[in-house]
Amino acid sequence: ADDVERLCESHPEIAAVVVTSPTYEGVISDIAQIARVAHAHHVRVIVDEAHGAHLPFIKPEYSAIHMGADVVVQSLHKTLPAMTQTAVIHVCTEELVKPVEQALEIFLSSSPSYIFMMNMEAAICYMADHDFTEYENNLREFRENCAKLPQITMIEKEAVCAAGAYGYDETRLVYSAAVPGPELLAMLADKGDVVCEMAGRKHVVLISTVRDGQEDFEQLYRTLQMCDVALTKEGDHEKERCAGQEELQKLAGTLARAPIYVYPPGSYIVNTGEIITAETVEKLCAYQAAGLHIRGI
């Protein structure tokens, strides 16, 4: 919120603020405070809640819909029992309904998929009609068990909030170990056919949903135990020298000819025309050493 206020004061021409909450890793922003600051400067708040479609049904206090955002976008297919490509826009401010409708007329197809729309309605009705106490209990027990693993660390809400976050979505399962993220991802696939959502330089991300039962959590925990046994305590894994580091060093101080990013998730590290700094080169070197896929170089 402090960053938003500083930007709004420095740039009075700003019309809207776009915030991603929760993040890929499940970090929740204080949308209520951000909205208060932005609205005081007559700035709209648009929240990318793509990974939080389940929040209104499980943790409504974490959903931007209930925190003062003007527009909230959710990808139902990410965390609800809905088909890929299904998403919704929540227009929470009455005076924006008409402008959003006009924009949709321009950008949306005039022949929408009724199969998708029926599936979306079914998914929302499923969430509204069910109680998820059993799921939450299973998830809590699973997370408590994971905390006992000596070699694999799972991100906990307390640590995330202590680092300054407003909240944490505990359905997001984020693990790190003494090996790079891609190596842990491959290990989970090899030991138990577990398909991770993504791997970062030092972590992997898995998504739990309300359709996961106790048996699913038990199977995942068994796989984590096998991976934990395979990891040695001696594995400090000194930083490897980045393959092609000399070529990367030559990029320092030059202009990027194309966007440079790691995929997934696809967020730009450097955009076209921006200066590639020495710090950026160091970061790219670390990503490459970890085995991540860098695009644009």
Residues of each region from the PLM?
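Conserved C-terminal alpha-helix-loop-beta "cap" of PLP-dependent enzymes
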Residues: A147, Q151, I155-P265, N271-E279, ...
